[in-house]
């Protein structure tokens, strides 16, 4: 007889190493932007622009490739480890395709993209070659993620943690060499930060290859002994991964768009939003790590056809996520003034940020429900409907509500935080409904998605058609909304342009943080980077 405490301990043993790895990755981003800032304002601006364009795409790529986790965990639960090499090779193949597509997009569109941003020549130069180094980063990360999925499932999440803990100091050394040009190397400034990132992930890939090849449990030699890839594995990888990647991209795009609408309220409000966003994103690592751990545990349990065990892990996940959110939300509210003062010495900005942090506390509580459920559903390979629900919650709920509160009710900048809380709340509600539906149908042994992936056949075609028809109807309603909102949106964008607020020029505010200087946009980039599912 297992107790809830034992299930929580098992969950934490998987979750905490993932959390440490997430923090290590955020450390790479922080080191890059901080050291680039000391190289000069043009270098920092170029890195900020390049990172702002790149990280939403990278997060989506990682979200897609992390689909290997439930696929491999399910195989292990089914006691079919011989299938692991095929899934890993499928992930590596998809990663290679993504790399070539990203490289081609860079060559074809980089000139037009930078021209459309109307950047200063020095900033555009740094951004161009920073993004060139990111092509290499895409290759290395696309190779790392499938291997990480393997080590997390067939090995231990502590393996990834140990490897990622090596990354920040290695990255700092490379930054020191290439940004500032020490030991006879050329001084590359912000471009050096990109080169350092690429070399750091290359170093990580080498470490992962060594670990995988040395472990018989990870079947490293079997993975690279053949290049055979099963079409069914590639198809399943994409079916599970594409909705996850798109969900991340849609979410991050919304946060980026909100910055544009907040720009008309002035630099103080924009800076305060980005402080609150950055802090909330750091806190968000907790439910994300819980979600990733739940994916591994539940996929393994489902693969073993142990549904009661999967339900126990679900319960443990909610206890951990909600307990953590209650603590972080309480600390956010109680210490909001201190948090704002940690980011900036500007009293006005800190005061506005304190108000925004109150809203972020509500956001944290809803996230503690929504994010773990996403991990549970991912463990069941149920991602397509979850993606539709995410789009409805954020783009059909959060964004329209923000515009309504701002332009109809007149709540000003607070409208966008209230809209975010509303959107995350809608996401939590929809995810609960989806999970309840999934569990009920599993009880009847007729879950369409579950039956399709676990048994390779559809037991109830009528149920599948009903779900598809419902999703199509919701998508049509969402498109209709966008058509109605198009004129209003164009008008708002024009108002912002007329206000002459440009977050990409040197007129942006610079916030002193400790011994470093972070710009408004810098803080935003850090927030987006830590929110991402980057390995």
Task: Describe the role of every protein-language-model region.
Residues 23, 27-45, 114-121, 177-188, ...:
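Helix-terminus/linker motif at the lipid-water interface of multi-pass membrane proteins
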Residues 448-535:
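A detector of single, family-specific signature residues
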Residues 65, 134-152, 160-171, 193-208, ...:
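Short runs within selected transmembrane alpha-helices of multi-pass transporters and secretion channels
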Residues 1-18, 72-139, 185-242, 298-363, ...:
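Short alpha-helical transmembrane segments in multi-pass integral membrane proteins
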Residues 44-104, 141-160, 259, 270-336, ...:
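Small-residue-rich hydrophobic transmembrane alpha-helices
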Residues 36-55, 87, 122-126, 190-191, ...:
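Interfacial/gating helices of multi-pass transporter permease domains
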Residues 13-29, 133, 167, 200-204, ...:
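Transmembrane helical elements of multi-pass membrane transporters/channels
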Residues 6-34, 38-39, 52-71, 96-103, ...:
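N-terminal transmembrane alpha-helices
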